[in-house]
UniProtKB/Swiss-Prot annotation:
Coiled coil: none annotated. GO terms for molecular function: ion channel regulator activity. This is Protein unc-1. Gene3D superfamilies: 6.10.250.2090, Band 7 domain (3.30.479.30). Belongs to the band 7/mec-2 family. It comes from Caenorhabditis elegans. Its main location: membrane. Changing residue 184 to V: In e580; no effect on unc-9 localization to gap junction in PLM neurons. It is a multi-pass membrane protein. PROSITE patterns: BAND_7.
Length: 285
């Protein structure tokens, strides 16, 4: 053993003079202010030519969302009218607020009762919140179109063929409600959904046409049979009346003669009742 004292390990604690990770957010803010000051100096030096780049005209149906050094500019969407853009540090996006009409491509849909149909629809929508349409989704218009297709397929897939053909307005209202709820977070307002056409397979169309024709023929036969029944009943009642009243028979006889004479025939068959010859037959006997 050495006479030297054994030294204990020394632990080094971080001192207050050691480097601390910088606050990147603070540095970025300072750098942003500096860049903004330089941009203003550049605008002033190049005035009035810089106004050609800084001033933008926004139409009545447009709004502009401005980002300054990556952050949304206070005040929300700008427009309509003239706005001021600082070069180098400002970026902006124009948003059209007009209603967009989108014709949904024909969708092959399997109904609840396993019938494949082709459905066409039209969706009318517009941007209601420009900031949400920029911040919350990459392309609000394209995303709304895709969602419209899937919503139409899902809504019609829960219906039978008969419900599809007879409840178009209810189906359109259901699609509008679902689509409007799905696009609300994107700043899009769905105005209306219309189901244009529901096309059936040719074989099913022919079968339905044959069924409808058979149903029409059956109804026609029923109506004809009911008419014959009513006519027979009327004839029976007339015969009972004539049998009870001989004068009515004579009147009917004269009416028939009048009808024959009105036809201007050269030959007229005059029916004579057998009872008229009864007296002559008795006299001969």
């Amino acid at each position: 053993m050495s006479n030297k004292e054994r030294t204990e390990p020394q632990w080094v604690t971080p001192s207050s003079n050691q480097d601390v990770p910088p606050d990147y957010e603070t540095i970025g803010t300072i750098f942003g202010y500096a860049l903004q000051a330089l941009s203003w100096i550049l605008i002033i030096v190049t005035f009035p030519f810089s106004m050609c780049v800084c001033l933008k005209v926004i139409k009545e149906y447009e709004r502009v969302v401005i980002f300054r050094i990556g952050r949304l500019v206070f005040g929300g969407a700008r427009g309509p009218g003239m706005i001021f853009i600082i070069p180098c540090i400002d970026t902006y996006r124009k948003i059209d607020l007009r209603v967009v009409s989108y014709a949904v491509p024909p969708q092959e849909i399997l109904s609840k009762d396993s019938v494949t149909v082709s459905v066409d629809a039209v969706v009318y929508f517009r941007t209601s919140d420009p900031i949400a349409s920029v911040n919350n989704v990459d392309d609000a218009i394209y995303s709304t179109k895709l969602l419209a297709q899937t919503t139409l397929r899902n809504a019609l897939g829960m219906k039978t063929l008969t419900e599809m053909l007879t409840e178009r307005e209810a189906i359109a209202q259901l699609c509008e409600t679902i689509l409007d709820e799905g696009t609300e977070h994107w700043g899009v307002k769905v105005e209306r959904v219309e189901v244009k056409d529901i096309r059936l397979p040719q074989q099913l169309t022919r079968a339905m046409a044959a069924e409808a024709e058979a149903a029409r023929e059956a109804r026609a036969k029923v109506v004809a049979a009911e008419g014959e029944q009513k006519a027979s009943r009327a004839l029976k009642e007339a015969a009972d009346v004539i049998q009870a009243n001989p004068v009515a028979l004579q009147l009917r006889h004269l009416q028939a003669l009048n009808s024959i004479a009105a036809e201007h025939n050269s030959t007229i068959v005059f029916p004579v009742p057998v009872e008229m010859f009864g007296a002559f037959m008795k006299k001969d006997q």
